[in-house]
Amino acid sequence: MGPTAAGKSDLGIELALALGGEVVNADSMQLYRGMDIGTAKVPLEQRRGVPHHLLDVWDVTRAADVASFQADARRVIDGLLAVGRTPVLVGGSGLYLRAALDDLTFPGTDPAVRARWERELASRGAPALHGELARLAPRAAAAILPTNGRRIVRALEVVELTGTFEATLPEHRSVYDVVQIGIDRTDLDERIVERVERMWGAGFPDEVRRLAEMGLREGRTASRALGYAQLLAWFDGAMDSAEEAKQATITATRRFARRQRSWFRRDERIVWLDQPDVTQVLRLVGSL
């Protein structure tokens, strides 16, 4: 686990080979079918024969659902453990990793309630709905920016369905025996630039065009993914050039990496490395 562009995917494959394991994806955007270049999904021919689970399971029009991912991930993990294989979870989506590994439960959803609040969002705007949330659940409102319409709508939905909203996650409590390895690097900013340049060189704009024809704009989650959102903005005339979209992607990715660092650093169970060194990780696994 760790911020984007740190080298997690290659290390995951090395660990799976060394431990007799299989990779379980915990990157929320790699769940989406066809989102390959922009999410740095490892191509099949580079996986070195290691099975990868929970890649390409959702259409781009589907909204992200962490509770559904939790059920799928635990089914895969339990299945691997039952046959003596080691699950190697790889990803930078902190909530998804916690959902798979920790004792977390998630409130249900109601499409009708969600749709009603989304209509309210469209007509009244995020700040007005944030005021409504502050009246109903002040702690929840304090944890959500007034401009984050998606999170405000979800919080209002939960409050309506359950009568409450817990704004913070519970204490870290694993449901499996887990060794958590975090990868962070001092050269991360440079690696992000290199990754985005490779994405453009590999035909990323064409990938986004294809996905736009498949309904990417209608996908509440996929359309907001790093790079995809910026290219859609260029296609729709909100940016002047592909170069502007590229630079905006670099800026947004660096900002996202800082948020990832902040999230993961709160978890004292994670052992941090500054390089993806499989030998060092195997020593850590053997010592615990």
Swiss-Prot record:
TM ranges: none
**Which GO biological process entries does UniProt record here?**
tRNA modification
Q: Where is this site: Interaction with substrate tRNA?
A: 93, 114
Molecular function terms from GO = ATP binding; tRNA dimethylallyltransferase activity
Recorded hits in InterPro entries, A to Z, give: Dimethylallyltransferase, IPT, P-loop_NTPase
EC number(s) on file: 2.5.1.75
Task: Provide the catalytic activity annotation.
Answer: adenosine(37) in tRNA + dimethylallyl diphosphate = N(6)-dimethylallyladenosine(37) in tRNA + diphosphate
Region Interaction with substrate tRNA: which residues? 27-30
Cofactor (UniProt): Mg(2+)
Residues that coordinate or bind substrate? 4-9
Q: Which family does it belong to?
A: Belongs to the IPP transferase family.
Summarize the protein's role: Catalyzes the transfer of a dimethylallyl group onto the adenine at position 37 in tRNAs that read codons beginning with uridine, leading to the formation of N6-(dimethylallyl)adenosine (i(6)A).
Q: Which HAMAP family match?
A: IPP_trans (MF_00185)
Protein name as annotated: tRNA dimethylallyltransferase
Species the sequence originates in = Frankia alni (strain DSM 45986 / CECT 9034 / ACN14a)
The taxonomic lineage of its organism, from the top, reads: Bacteria, Bacillati, Actinomycetota, Actinomycetes, Frankiales
Question: What gene makes this protein?
Answer: miaA
